[in-house]
Amino acid sequence: MPIRNIAVGSHQEVYHPGALKAALAEFISTLIFVFAGQGSGMAFSKLTGGGATTPAGLIAAAVAHAFALFVAVSVGANISGGHVNPAVTFGAFVGGNITLFRGLLYWIAQLLGSTVACFLLRFSTGGLATGTFGLTGVSVWEALVLEIVMTFGLVYTVYATAVDPKKGSLGTIAPIAIGFIVGANILVGGAFDGASMNPAVSFGPALVSWSWESQWVYWVGPLIGGGLAGVIYEVLFISHTHEQLPTTDY
């Protein structure tokens, strides 16, 4: 059971060179992802005169985020696991695959990466505002359910393709599968709540623009969805090896 595998770890872990390198990898991967994802939306809006919220803008956002996440996960996979998302890190924690202290280190790196990406975008685009997440035609509770379900699908995909020790050669396509599910979910939820699935992705633009409306939805929803996916996959589908009982010949 994952609850028995959950580990707090030691505070000294945050100073370990391996943990610091992993955190740096998360910072860089998240910066790459947010810069490309947010930047594509800003560029599309500039070229179309505010058309980022049109059907074409939604498709462009889905494709850009899918490609960017594919790259971000790939470049970080061998160093940190390529989480690029506090909800993925939380799902790994509740499944017993990362310690609390290392997970918190990842969170800090991911939030910093998103924030720096948004500041860089604002500076390099002549002061254009980064796109913040908001609700359109749905209540906060409906948006919360959307974020839970979409993030569940994302973290479940992460477990199936990257975490499961039985994944075999499937692990080679993990970044592609993870990018695809995010792109597909953006097509589903983008028109309603922006389809964050990632607290870091919504935190950076909110901080830079200082716009916190419904921000809690983009934390609570992904963390619930990611946590549920981690526990369910770990409990139901990851087999734990047991020592065979000795046999006696009569």
Curated annotation (Swiss-Prot):
The record's principal subcellular location, in a coarse class, is: membrane
A Gene Ontology biological process noted in the UniProt record is: water transport
Induction section of the entry: By osmotic stress and abscisic acid (ABA). Down-regulated by chilling.
Q: Keyword Cell wall biogenesis/degradation: yes or no? A: no
One cellular component term (GO) for this entry is: plant-type vacuole membrane
Query: One GO molecular-function annotation for this sequence?
Result: water channel activity
Membrane topology term reads: Multi-pass membrane protein
Point out the signal peptide segment. Answer: none
Keyword field: Membrane, Repeat, Stress response, Transmembrane, Transmembrane helix, Transport, Vacuole
Q: Where is this motif: NPA 1?
A: 85-87
Q: Name one Pfam family in it.
A: MIP
Motif NPA 2, per the record, lies over 198-200
User: Where does the entry say this protein is expressed, by tissue?
Assistant: Expressed in roots and leaves.
Locate the transmembrane regions by residue number: 25-44, 58-77, 103-121, 144-163, 170-192, 216-233
Location comes to:
Vacuole membrane
* Function as written in the Swiss-Prot or TrEMBL entry: Aquaporins facilitate the transport of water and small neutral solutes across cell membranes. May be involved in transport from the vacuolar compartment to the cytoplasm.
What domain notes does the record hold?
Aquaporins contain two tandem repeats each containing three membrane-spanning domains and a pore-forming loop with the signature motif Asn-Pro-Ala (NPA).
Protein family according to the UniProt entry: Belongs to the MIP/aquaporin (TC 1.A.8) family. TIP (TC 1.A.8.10) subfamily.
In Swiss-Prot or TrEMBL terms, this protein is called: Probable aquaporin TIP1-1
Q: What organism does the UniProt record list as the source? A: Oryza sativa subsp. japonica (Rice)
